[in-house]
């Protein structure tokens, strides 16, 4: 079958590579976000999807908007209409990042078919992986559904489930779901083309929402229970990174491990103490071990190494706080 692929970041590129390699599928065009400033030099660079498409010599379109009446939107309608006339029957979507108007959703016979990183209708929205981790879900998964005008509300064609490990971060979970989900996406597209796919409507009453993540969401409230704080840290690793404040400066916090209260003196929420090889912080229910920390202006490092250079500071048992200087 012939398809268009729409996506932008690294997980989408991983899915695109799989679809290109699948002999049942011909990716005839790719749609992605325009080049953006990335990296330390802040130079304009193509998306990860654009890089994969260009290496495979697949025509690539970088429309900034699909809105009717705009130059890029009108061009998109002409191009996609021509592709439909040439036998393209579906568009596969993975983290595209652009609103797709209804008339464009209707261009292809099987519509625009999206890989979403949750068991819909649970965790509709931009950050389903992070939401599942932060909520303490034990199981998550991926859904293949046909996009309609509502946010992640379309009928579901296929799903897979996956257990969430006790130390899984958002990065870990996103990677594993991408590799499993890309196979499900390919198989579902082919099933649609062969008339074998069965789509089921979602139960809106069971829907939960996962809005876009902002840095403020990753700030640690040390008065919360230890297990909640661990989940927040895992959900925001690697980006934007769980963080806290010490003397008005931001510190990013890496992996947090449970600690036996018998191993350390009683600590108040946010209170920090170091032993020769470990760093502990108090929470609302008991201590956690900080294994990695990123001080201001430095790279992430082992917490014990940081503590060895901060003996005078830590001797006073400082406390991570919740307000920045000037607030």
From Swiss-Prot:
Name the enzyme's class.
transferase
Q: Indicate whether Methyltransferase appears among the record's keywords.
A: no
**From the UniProt record, which GO molecular function terms apply?**
methionyl-tRNA formyltransferase activity
PANTHER family assigned:
METHIONYL-TRNA FORMYLTRANSFERASE, METHIONYL-TRNA FORMYLTRANSFERASE, MITOCHONDRIAL
Q: Which reaction does it catalyse?
A: L-methionyl-tRNA(fMet) + (6R)-10-formyltetrahydrofolate = N-formyl-L-methionyl-tRNA(fMet) + (6S)-5,6,7,8-tetrahydrofolate + H(+)
Q: What is this protein called?
A: Methionyl-tRNA formyltransferase
Instruction: Give the gene name.
Output: fmt
Q: Which CDD domains match?
A: FMT_core_Met-tRNA-FMT_N (cd08646), Met_tRNA_FMT_C (cd08704)
Positions binding (6S)-5,6,7,8-tetrahydrofolate in this chain are 118-121
**What is the purpose of this protein?**
Attaches a formyl group to the free amino group of methionyl-tRNA(fMet). The formyl group appears to play a dual role in the initiator identity of N-formylmethionyl-tRNA by promoting its recognition by IF2 and preventing the misappropriation of this tRNA by the elongation apparatus.
Listed EC numbers:
2.1.2.9
Keyword terms: Protein biosynthesis, Transferase
Q: Which Pfam families match?
A: Formyl_trans_C (PF02911), Formyl_trans_N (PF00551)
Which cellular components does GO assign to this protein? cytosol
| Organism of provenance | Corynebacterium jeikeium (strain K411)
